[in-house]
Amino acid sequence: LIEYERGTIFAIDGGEDAPGLLAPAAGPGRDGARPATADLGRPARERFARAFDKNDKRPRVAVIITGLGLARDTSFRAIEEMPSDVTLAFSPYSDALAPLLARARDKGHEILLAVPMEPADPRRRDAGPSALSVSHSEGATRQRLQTMLGLVHSHVGIVGDLGDRFARDPVAMKPVLEELAAKGLLYVENRLETPDSGTISNGVPTASVSIWLDRDLAPEAIEREIKAAEALAKRTGS
């Protein structure tokens, strides 16, 4: 595994779904994933999830690569080279989202949108012009999120990008979780100190990072983190 662009490879506890193929891709729209909660009675997070055998009770580890889309060629290489069980998170700042998403779905990858959120040190880490900020009104936060969600399709949810200030603010996060609940999406918190994954917040299934795999990019260091993720999954049963 390698770091792609400025993205982070990390492991989270996995979910479950019935075995089968990925659902056909939905078309993009103003409000993002379409169809969502009304689609065949299943929310988008289930409709577009990568399926696995729920009767297989072995512990699971979910791996997500974030920050894709900022460099077209590197992103296509990630889609082609990563196993289809790896979830890919794409930046809304990409200028090649449509072909990247189409190829990712064709290769069987589950898709997340990496939503930029205000960091604790914005002068050192720039989340970009579309970032969600604690200074925004609830309406502005909803509008920004809806605009970003409208850029992608066939995704199961979002993962926070930076956001160690925004995501800690329950008032700021409230409209985000409400929008995700309405669209049948899940939320992945990209911070190690958050509660265990698998919880429900404002009606939204949430997961949090258990281990970062690329703190040290040396192959042997990444291998150690992978083994640590395996050990954690065996210890916790997920």
Where are these regions (language model features)?
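Terminal interaction modules at protein C-ends
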Residues: L1-K57
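Active-site beta->alpha N-cap acidic-glycine motif
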Residues: R42-R125
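Catalytic-core regions of hydrolytic enzymes
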Residues: A96-L97, D106-H109, E118, P122, ...
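Catalytic domains of cell-wall/extracellular-matrix polysaccharide-remodeling enzymes
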Residues: E138-E223
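Catalytic grooves of carbohydrate-active enzymes
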Residues: R165, A229-S238
